[in-house]
Amino acid sequence: MGEFPERLRKLRESMRPVRSMTVTSQLMGLSPDALRKYERGEVEPKMTALKLIAAYYHISLDELCK
């Protein structure tokens, strides 16, 4: 995944208004713990989670995982 954790954090922080990790994860349909681990690079998200994240940010999977 390379720079995925940093990209994910920057996507969340670039949204206006800026939302907390808890609110963002709930809107995505993920648990706050899962999003936290993805942003820290502790766990790589599975395809299901990647699709939820990409849909939330209105970007393609390619853009998300580049």
Regions found by a protein language model. Give the residues of each.
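Residues that mark the N-terminal boundary/hinge immediately upstream of a DNA-recognition element
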Residues: 7, 19-20, 46-49, 60
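Short alpha-helical DNA-recognition segment
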Residues: 16-37
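A short, Lys/Arg-rich alpha-helix, primarily the initiator
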Residues: 1-17, 23
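DNA major-groove recognition helix of helix-turn-helix/homeodomain DNA-binding modules
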Residues: 29, 48-63
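Short, charged recognition helix plus adjacent turn
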Residues: 1-2, 14-15, 37, 55, ...
